[in-house]
């Protein structure tokens, strides 16, 4: 499956000057919500991702996503894997498990995002689950922006990667775009970064 074509066809590969939820600026933005608004395509992508995970022979009992961006991807992945799904969300800027969701002691959980940039949100989600006794066994995403090391990719982890090196990150593709710290962003000379993502919006 050509993941880049899926994003392009859904008009979900945006070009401009963007402020990512990680804090970096970039000339490209992946709007996964546009891809996932098609239920059949969402199912196909999740099945492809589930195949990678199943081939690794991991014991996964639950998928958890940080709201809002990861919810659709996580739910479809959980359905493809045949396990339950829960999500964490921010309350007063602190990631929290609410809505009656519970985790069992040593429950094996995969944390799923739509896009992984630095993995900061995924790690906030993982920390909440670990504090409640769960065991994080892997991370997943539809796409990886190339900062974190993806399983089966030749690319190495880059500066700013937050995910632990001993746990696998499963994603369908690496999307490697230029990213800049706000203090050294060349795009800021001609335009103001816009924030199309879900954190804070």
Swiss-Prot record:
What's the cofactor?
A: Mg(2+)
Which EC numbers characterise this protein's activity in its record?
2.4.2.10
Catalysed conversion reaction: orotidine 5'-phosphate + diphosphate = orotate + 5-phospho-alpha-D-ribose 1-diphosphate
Name the positions where orotate binds: 117, 145
What is this enzyme's class at the first EC digit?
transferase
The organism's superkingdom is given as: Bacteria
Family matches, as InterPro entries: OPRT, Orotate_PRibTrfase_bac, PRibTrfase_dom, PRTase-like
Alphabetical list of CDD domains matching this protein = PRTases_typeI
Tell me the Gene Ontology biological-process terms attached to this UniProt entry: 'de novo' UMP biosynthetic process; pyrimidine nucleobase biosynthetic process
Matches recorded under PROSITE patterns: PUR_PYR_PR_TRANSFER
GO MF annotation terms: magnesium ion binding; orotate phosphoribosyltransferase activity
Q: Which UniProt keywords apply?
A: Glycosyltransferase, Magnesium, Pyrimidine biosynthesis, Transferase
Disulfides per UniProt: none
Per the record, the pathway is: Pyrimidine metabolism; UMP biosynthesis via de novo pathway; UMP from orotate: step 1/2
Q: How does it assemble?
A: Homodimer.
The family this protein is said to belong to: Belongs to the purine/pyrimidine phosphoribosyltransferase family. PyrE subfamily.
According to its UniProt entry, the function of this protein is described as:
Catalyzes the transfer of a ribosyl phosphate group from 5-phosphoribose 1-diphosphate to orotate, leading to the formation of orotidine monophosphate (OMP).
Protein's name in the database: Orotate phosphoribosyltransferase
What organism does this protein naturally occur in?
A: Helicobacter pylori (strain J99 / ATCC 700824) (Campylobacter pylori J99)
Gene that specifies this protein: pyrE
């Amino acid at each position: 499956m050509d993941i880049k074509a899926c994003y392009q066809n859904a008009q979900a590969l945006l070009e401009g000057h963007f402020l990512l939820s990680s804090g970096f600026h970039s000339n490209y933005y992946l709007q996964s919500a546009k891809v996932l608004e098609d239920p059949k395509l969402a199912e196909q992508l999740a099945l492809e991702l589930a195949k990678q995970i199943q081939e690794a022979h991991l014991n996964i009992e639950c998928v958890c996503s940080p709201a809002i961006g990861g919810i659709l991807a996580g739910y479809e992945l959980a359905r493809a894997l045949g396990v339950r799904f829960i999500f964490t969300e921010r309350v007063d800027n602190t990631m929290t498990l609410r809505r009656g969701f519970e985790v069992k002691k040593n429950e094996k959980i995969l944390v799923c995002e739509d896009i992984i940039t630095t993995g900061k949100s995924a790690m906030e989600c993982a920390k909440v689950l670990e504090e409640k006794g769960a065991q994080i066994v892997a991370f997943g995403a539809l796409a990886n922006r190339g900062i974190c090391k993806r399983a089966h990719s030749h690319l190495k982890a880059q500066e700013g990667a937050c995910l632990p090196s001993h746990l696998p990150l499963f994603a369908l593709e690496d999307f490697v775009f230029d990213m800049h710290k706000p203090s050294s962003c060349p795009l800021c000379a001609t335009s103001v970064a816009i924030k199309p993502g879900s954190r804070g919006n």
